[in-house]
Design a protein with these regions (language model features):
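Active-site flanking residues adjacent to catalytic metal/cofactor-binding acidic residues
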Residues: 51, 75, 173, 194, ...
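Active-site neighborhood of divalent metal-dependent phosphoester bond hydrolases
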Residues: 95-99, 107-133
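Residues in the short beta-alpha loop(s) of Rossmann-like NAD(P)-binding domains
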Residues: 11, 105-107, 228-231
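Residue-level signal for inorganic ion chemistry
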Residues: 5, 111, 223
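Active-site metal-binding motif and surrounding structural segment of the metallo-beta-lactamase
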Residues: 46-103, 189-191
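Core dinuclear metal-dependent hydrolase active-site scaffold
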Residues: 1-64, 130-181, 250-256
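Binuclear metal-ion centers of metallo-dependent hydrolases, dominated by the metallo-beta-lactamase
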Residues: 179-256
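Short internal beta-strands
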Residues: 99-106, 224-226
Length: 256
């Protein structure tokens, strides 16, 4: 059974365009420059694994006609990865089953403290989520729809985020540097989906030149850029990057 990976959003924390309508260097005539905040969907049969609940989650799910969510993985606690969490209520209304969410202890604690009603319930609001601390290796789903994962601890500025490896694909949406251990975990990839914020250096994200250096070390067959700021026009970036590296876009699908 094939696995389908959908990039629901590939924009940086303010999206493209920003809320004030500013596109930066991105051509507004190119639909691939319209970027919602980072989120990913992995589909195998009826098993839908969502990575992160961006503030744009509702529109992302509607645009991609997503009718069910089986599990949710979180990369880290920042608002551009978590603040769409309330939209998960729709899937409890349909199934009447709590949704299992997974991440490291820091992220789970943040979600529980800030969205307590989703875990404990409130008047007229039943609890919809069940918290789980992530393991290094784990599987989600059943029988031929099961997906095997490996979680990787990745430096993201002052904190550590999680990257996920599955079916020789790695998803690392937020990253400032890669350790020797990370390099071993990311060996022999078919596809690397990687943070590439802008051309200038940033303390908590990789820039374009840093991504090129990393790709030359890891040597994945294909690299897709995500978490892109308004500096990075799709066509310009596509022409500038080597042939094995391309910018992602909202709605992009990868088949594995």
């Amino acid at each position: 059974m094939k696995t389908i990976i959908t990039i629901l959003g590939c924009g940086s924390s303010m999206g493209v365009p920003r809320a004030d309508g500013f596109w930066g260097k991105c051509d507004p005539k190119n639909k691939k420059n319209y970027r919602t905040r980072c989120s990913l969907l992995i589909t195998k049969g009826n098993n839908n694994v969502l990575i992160d609940t961006s503030p744009d989650l509702r529109l992302q799910l509607l645009s991609n006609k997503v009718k069910n969510i089986s599990y949710v993985l979180y990369t880290h606690k920042h608002g551009d990865q978590t603040h769409g969490i309330n939209d998960l209520r729709a899937f409890y209304i349909n199934s009447k089953k709590k949704l299992n969410i997974f991440s490291n202890k820091e992220t789970i604690n943040y979600l529980y403290q800030n969205f307590t009603y989703l875990f404990k319930g409130a008047p007229d609001y039943p609890p919809i989520l069940k918290k789980n601390i992530i393991k290094k290796k784990f599987s989600l789903g059943f029988q031929n729809e099961k997906i095997n994962f490996k979680s990787i601890k990745i430096k993201h500025g002052k904190i550590f985020a999680l990257g996920y490896v599955f079916k020789n694909i790695a998803y690392i949406s937020d990253c400032s540097s890669v350790s020797e251990k990370n390099i071993k975990d990311l060996a022999n990839l078919n596809t690397l989906i990687i943070d590439c914020l802008r051309f200038k250096v940033h303390y908590s994200h990789l820039n374009f030149d840093e991504v090129i250096k990393l790709v030359n070390i890891l040597k994945p067959k294909k690299t897709i850029l995500t978490n892109m700021h308004i500096d990075l026009d799709y066509e310009y970036l596509k022409k500038k990057a080597p042939k094995n590296i391309c910018p992602g876009y909202d709605g992009m699908k990868i088949y594995a």
